[in-house]
UniProtKB/Swiss-Prot annotation:
It holds the Pfam family Rib_5-P_isom_A. It comes from Caulobacter vibrioides (strain NA1000 / CB15N). It catalyses: aldehydo-D-ribose 5-phosphate = D-ribulose 5-phosphate. This is Ribose-5-phosphate isomerase A. GO terms for molecular function: ribose-5-phosphate isomerase activity. InterPro entries: NagB/RpiA_transferase-like, Ribose5P_isomerase_typA_subgr, Ribose5P_isomerase_type_A. Transmembrane segments: none annotated. Keywords: Isomerase.
Length: 227
């Protein structure tokens, strides 16, 4: 089974968790897109989707899913989103799609969070996938210097500003992304705290103690994982 098929079946399994009347957080990325498509196909009544990016909002509108802003709901019943890595205890690296801030805001407003992924996303330790760090544009070079100091404290390479063909990658919120490649993050909790202490850092892609369940697509079907 291809990785894309594994993503599809995990998204379809997650769509079965949604019930009529729910407020649903809609994740961002290729795996989350499969969930959004499967959710639309179910034709549930009175659901509202809270998108985590402009791209997800556009897809949901195209498929006819009613949307709500996060500020217009008191609680999100269920959020389904992908991940770049799934480590021990359902610790996650997210943000490869440059939507980590809005994703984390929706996750933290949710009663239940389910991560979906293909089998390759499961890892024994976080860090092979570059850790995204969202920073404000003003003074970002100096913020990068401070991030490099933190990286050195954790025996990690210095982060690099994420760029694309047209220049710097800019998030939906107008911020920039630095990626901290490592190979292995020995202490994700300590690193998360250190990154958040830097003025200019909006947030980072370490999602710790947030996922309630993972649905991982494999060649044998969907595997359910608990923290």
């Amino acid at each position: 089974m291809s990785a894309d098929d594994q993503k599809r079946i995990s998204g379809e399994a997650a769509a079965e968790l949604v019930e009529n009347g729910m407020v649903v957080g809609l994740g961002t990325g290729s795996t989350a897109a499969w969930f959004v498509k499967a959710l639309a196909a179910r034709g549930l009544k009175d659901i509202r989707g809270v998108p985590t990016s402009d791209a997800t909002a556009a897809l949901a509108r195209e498929l006819g899913i009613p949307l709500a802003a996060l500020d217009d709901v008191k609680t999100v019943d269920l959020t389904v989103d992908g991940a770049d890595e799934i480590g021990p205890g359902l610790s996650l690296i997210k943000g490869g799609g440059a939507a980590l801030l809005r994703e984390k805001l929706v996750w933290e407003a949710s009663t239940r969070c389910v991560v979906i992924a293909d089998a390759a996303k499961r890892v024994p330790a976080l860090g092979k996938f570059p850790l995204p760090i969202e920073v404000v544009r003003f003074g970002h070079v100096h913020t990068g210097y401070r991030l490099a100091d933190i990286a050195a404290e954790f025996d990690l390479p210095p982060p690099r500003l994420r760029t694309a063909e047209r220049g710097m990658v800019v998030t939906d919120g107008g911020n920039l992304i630095y990626d901290m490649a490592s190979g292995k993050i020995e202490d994700p909790t300590a690193l998360a705290a250190a990154l958040k202490s830097v003025t200019g850092v909006v947030d980072h892609g370490l999602f710790l103690d947030l996922a309630d369940e993972a649905l991982v697509g494999t060649d044998e079907g969907v595997v359910r994982l608990q923290p």
